[in-house]
């Protein structure tokens, strides 16, 4: 639709040379270049605005899905907890609300979950100290004994 062939560009250049003249042609080309640059900048800005709106919409959809999944998991976990409690004592289960604000659920975005690898070196040392302390203070289970042998 907006295809510009080389022959059309040559025709426009010849007409511009004849109409504007060789003396003012460089200045005219600079003005045209500035206007084209402004048009490209405006187009890029407009396109980035649309991309940002699409990204925000997708993030809202993902947050809604996360809220639904968290509510389902919470309901399942509370249902399992109520089943074990009902076998030991007859108690009425509390109603589960679908409102995440009432459930005190904290949602995190994928950006909050990023880990800076440069800052994790001290975490590895703390982790080994913690596991050694925990392993010494708790009795070893057969699975843990096998895992400790594999690590050594």
Swiss-Prot record:
InterPro entries to which the protein is assigned, alphabetical: TatA/B/E, TatB
Membrane topology: Single-pass membrane protein
Cross-referenced Gene3D superfamilies: 1.20.5.3310
Main location: membrane
Single GO biological process annotation from the record: protein transport by the Tat complex
Record field: compositional bias (Basic and acidic residues): 60-71, 141-152
GO molecular function: protein transmembrane transporter activity
Places the protein is found: Cell inner membrane
Gene Ontology CC: TAT protein transport complex
Low complexity biased stretches: 84-98, 124-140
Chain intervals for the UniProt region annotation (Disordered): 60-152
A Pfam family hit: TatA_B_E
Transmembrane segments: 1-21
Keywords: Cell inner membrane, Cell membrane, Membrane, Protein transport, Translocation, Transmembrane, Transmembrane helix, Transport
Record family assignment: Belongs to the TatB family.
Function recorded in the entry: Part of the twin-arginine translocation (Tat) system that transports large folded proteins containing a characteristic twin-arginine motif in their signal peptide across membranes. Together with TatC, TatB is part of a receptor directly interacting with Tat signal peptides. TatB may form an oligomeric binding site that transiently accommodates folded Tat precursor proteins before their translocation.
Record text on subunit structure and interactions: The Tat system comprises two distinct complexes: a TatABC complex, containing multiple copies of TatA, TatB and TatC subunits, and a separate TatA complex, containing only TatA subunits. Substrates initially bind to the TatABC complex, which probably triggers association of the separate TatA complex to form the active translocon.
NCBIfam families linked to this entry: tatB
Protein name per its UniProtKB record: Sec-independent protein translocase protein TatB
Native source species: Zymomonas mobilis subsp. mobilis (strain ATCC 31821 / ZM4 / CP4)
Origin organism lineage: Bacteria, Pseudomonadati, Pseudomonadota, Alphaproteobacteria, Sphingomonadales
